[in-house]
Amino acid sequence: MLDLAQPRPTDLALDVATGTGNTALALAPFVRNVVGVDLTREMLDQARRVTAERGITNADWVLGDACRLPFGAESFDLYTVRAAPHHFHDFDAFLIEALRVLKPGRAAAFVDCAPPAAARDVMHQVEVRRDPSHVRSLTVDEWTARLKKAGFEVEVAKSRELDWDFEDWMGNMEVQPALAAELAALIEAADGEARAQLHPERRDGKLWHAYWHCLIRARKPA
């Protein structure tokens, strides 16, 4: 995220859907101040504890919704969001809000799951059963189109393919073994182009498959 966001020492940065503040705290040494915003009070409380433990003095935490940010227009020099947009029910409102709170000429960095089109249907079936809060993952091309529609100028839009440990992924959400087995079977049953993209395989009895993140930097016109 840091390479993508290109933070500057004078920046007032906003990290949206910050969770426990991992991205915001990674930005903190490189910016003047960072604000983390999240819908979940308990997550923000944990972020505050970590901030105090590390002696970080330039990070603040605000309760708020990515689609209705509690900030004025043109308030921030940098906007970041990681691993959250696939949960948003109103994707266009999220992008409009991102554009609104950015100062003219300043950039936003987006990282999220972004499977290619052929694999997406299979992965969507898996994602929504693993985590019911999942709404939809966009492809990189869809991200680019939606950002341009919202008024952004897209500077970087690329996909990073990862070698994904299915068992660990299920464990992160404490998925019950019977359901995990069903979801593994969905991936292993993929055919055609979806299978070629997912390339599932067993290694020492464990399922591995491809997973994708988009890495996007877009700028508000000056």
Predicted regions and their residues:
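A short SAM/SAH-binding and catalytic strip from SAM-dependent methyltransferases
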Residues: 77-90
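Conserved alpha-helix/loop element of class I SAM-dependent methyltransferases that forms part
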Residues: 1-11, 26
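Conserved class I S-adenosyl-L-methionine
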Residues: 107-134
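Class I SAM-dependent methyltransferase SAM/SAH-binding core
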Residues: 12-68
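Short alpha-helix
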Residues: 136-150
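A short acidic, Gly/Pro-enriched loop at the edge of an enzyme's catalytic core
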Residues: 67-78
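A short glycine-rich, Lys/Arg-flanked "PGG" loop and its adjoining helix->strand segment in the class I
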Residues: 92-107
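Conserved Class I S-adenosyl-L-methionine
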Residues: 20, 150, 155-222
